[in-house]
Structure formats: structure tokens, C-alpha cells
Design a protein with these regions (language model features):
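Conserved catalytic core of nucleotide-sugar-dependent glycosyltransferases
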Residues: 66-149
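Active-site acidic short loop of glycosyltransferases
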Residues: 51-54, 145
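Acidic donor-binding segment of Leloir-type glycosyltransferases
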Residues: 1-34
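C-terminal catalytic/acceptor-binding lobe
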Residues: 127-128, 148-231
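Active-site loop/turn elements of alpha/beta-hydrolase fold enzymes
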Residues: 11-13, 89, 176
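Conserved glycosyltransferase catalytic-site signature
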Residues: 40-45, 62-63, 70, 128-133, ...
Length: 231
């Protein structure tokens, strides 16, 4: 069994979400933020530092995974075989609106979805790195955590994997797919504007072109400017 806590952060001008259940292991935080752009990386770093566990999962609210894959991914970090671990093998399937509604109503389950998996759209090819992942909390924060230079939607999923690769830190993938629920695409599901798109793309290119020593210095300088202690 796994002792687990869930942390949810809402950033907006006014709170819109209320927890449906009361549980001492579920924590919800509201941050007043008038910006229309959600600074996801900054808030994820905050949640990561608040988390009490040694292993932290970062999870999009619109994805589903079989329990066995989640446990396999956690186990890889527990055993010291990975610093970052994905609870799926890279296949990221987009569910249509109809099946997403059936799942929400509990008229369809994960097993039934997986049986018809090849009817769904395989987004981003067979090697996706978005949606959900686990990390060794202390090691991940030491090597930069989430890159707060990404403001709004951007290629931060690819950047964190590239950073682990340059630093020589092991990544694990569990066997099996990830399912993405249908939802309308709003402002924070795509680049906010051309300026932000350019800045976020350039940040990925900047990191991807660094040597290990250059990246370590960049991480140290960046974390100092964000007020994150990585010592």
C-alpha cells in the first residue's frame, strides 16, 4: 500500500472550485492571481515543496491511468532505478467526447476503454512525455524542479526530459497507455500569444543546447532568482 496525499492549487481572481469530499490527506489551496495566463511551472514548484512525501506525482486533471501502471512507476523510484518515472509507455490516447462522458457517469470503465484503445487518436506519436509523471522529490528539486522560465502553455514536458538526459539522470516508463479525457481547449491549453510562444520555444532550445556543466550553472542561477533553495 502507498500512503498518499493529494494537493490541488487553484489560481484565479476568485475561487471557483470546491472540494467534493473532506479528507485530511487532500489539501486545496487558492492563490489570488489576476493574470489570464496560468504560470503552471511556478505553482507546481510551490506544491512540490509543500508535499510531505519523498516521491511526488505531477498529474493533469484530465488523464486516466490503470492503477497497476501507477504502482509500477512509483516502484521504479522507490528502488532507486529512476529519478523521473512515467506511469505509461508513451502512448497518449485522446478519448472522444462520448466515451469521456460515459466514464464520468461511470457507465464505462478503464478496462473497457483499454479494450477499444486502437479506436482512439494517438496524440503526439508513441513517445509522449506529458500528462503524468513521478519524481524523486529531493533530487528533482536539486536539479531545478519545474522550469519557471516557461510562462503559460509551452514545451516544458519535453524540456524536463531533455534536462534529465543532459544531467545523466535515469528515466523509467511503465508498460501501458495513458487516456486523455475530452474537454474544450481554452486559453491555457495553447500558447497565449506569439510573444509567449516564441519565448517558451526559445527556452527549450536554450536548455537543449547546453552541456552538463552549463546546465548546472543555469539551474543554480535560475533557482536563486526564483527563491528556490537547491543546496
Amino acid at each position: 500500500s502507498i500512503r498518499m496525499e493529494i494537493r490541488i492549487l487553484e489560481a484565479d481572481e476568485h475561487p471557483h472550485y470546491e472540494l467534493k469530499i473532506s479528507d485530511e490527506h487532500i489539501h486545496k489551496t487558492f492563490v489570488r492571481d489576476a493574470s489570464p495566463v496560468f504560470h503552471r511551472t511556478k505553482y507546481l514548484n510551490r506544491l512540490m515543496q509543500e508535499a510531505e512525501g519523498a516521491i511526488v506525482g505531477i498529474w493533469d486533471t484530465d488523464v486516466l491511468l490503470p492503477k497497476e501502471q501507477i504502482l509500477e512507476a512509483v516502484d521504479a523510484i522507490r528502488k532507486g532505478n529512476a529519478v523521473m518515472s512515467f506511469p505509461y509507455d508513451g502512448r497518449f490516447y485522446m478519448l472522444p467526447q462520448e466515451d469521456s462522458l460515459l466514464l464520468k457517469k461511470r457507465e464505462m470503465n478503464m478496462e473497457e476503454c483499454c479494450q477499444k484503445i486502437y479506436e482512439y487518436v494517438l496524440a503526439h506519436g508513441p513517445n509522449s512525455v506529458g500528462g503524468a509523471f513521478w519524481v524523486n522529490k529531493n533530487v528533482y528539486i536539486k536539479y531545478g524542479g519545474e522550469n519557471q522560465h516557461f510562462y503559460g502553455w509551452g514545451p516544458e514536458d519535453a524540456e524536463r526530459c531533455k534536462r534529465m538526459e543532459i544531467l545523466g539522470l535515469p528515466i523509467y516508463r511503465a508498460q501501458g497507455p495513458l487516456l486523455h479525457l475530452f474537454h474544450p481547449r481554452m486559453q491555457n491549453s495553447w500558447f497565449g500569444n506569439q510573444r509567449l510562444e516564441y519565448a517558451n520555444r526559445m527556452e527549450f532550445i536554450r536548455v537543449a543546447g547546453m552541456t552538463r556543466s552549463q546546465l548546472l550553472q543555469y539551474i543554480w542561477l535560475s533557482c536563486n532568482s526564483w527563491g528556490i533553495n537547491i543546496c
